[in-house]
Amino acid sequence: MITWTLLPVLLGALWLAWSNGANDNFKGVSTLYGSGTLSYRAALAWATVATLAGSLVSVWLAQSLVQTFSGNGLIPAGTLNDAMLAAIGIGAGTTVLLATWLGMPTSTTHALTGALMGAALVVDSGGVNWATLANNFAQPLLLSPLLAIGLILLLYPALHRLRLRLGIRETSCLCVGETPASALPAGVSAAALSMPAPGLSVAVGDLSGCATRYGGRFIGVDAHTAVNALHVLSAGSVCFARAVNDTPKIAALLLAATALGGQAQPAWAIALIALAMAAGGLIQSRRVAETLSRRITDLNHGQGLTAN
């Protein structure tokens, strides 16, 4: 049951969930859009489905994250209240939504950690549990990008060599199309240069000029079809895993509210957070999508799959 004391916390959590969806939902499928595997709308639809599924599954898979991001152990015991929880949600959500409006991919976990830290400092700067901050928050945030970079440095060359060994090659394309051509027959004035005449042009294209495909077969399946299918599945798994990770962090604000009395995780809290995340992604993902998919680097299908 939603009470008046819980309402500010609920609004703060939903605000944060909306912001999270707007900034994060598309990240997992950005390689699909950037490589041309799927259109923006198709990629967004796939991201939304995977996000909803991950949010619902998080009820069983991510209980420890609920405890971590409820402020227990970081904020001095007995000082956490509904007003503080609402402020944490609104502050973190506003930070993420501002970055989204600017088209900047950001981390909800970083924003939420900063909001929790700010609340702890306001309540009692001398009572902050710095060991908890370092071990449960700072350490994972610092190590995860380095781990991802290290893995891709090892994985991409290995997969590239495997592709070549299997006889799967990138194919060039021959672009043939009608194009205007200038003609100046004998006895015609120079003014005729401005009169276009139809003609044919032929050019050999590569990734920058036309779509790259993979030639060959893998386990009896067309290589390009296999790469695209695996790419789509990998992008969905990224969105699913992110939702499993992020939903409990946001729901923790609701579950820590005194109005809930520290009860077990209610299904309605997860459902509301999941719906808000999905709605935020559907309505406000475009700017972050363009940044991730178009402005950072060019990716082909294989590179997108490897990145995921």
Predicted features and spans:
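Interfacial segments of multi-pass membrane proteins
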Residues: 31-40, 113-127, 254-262
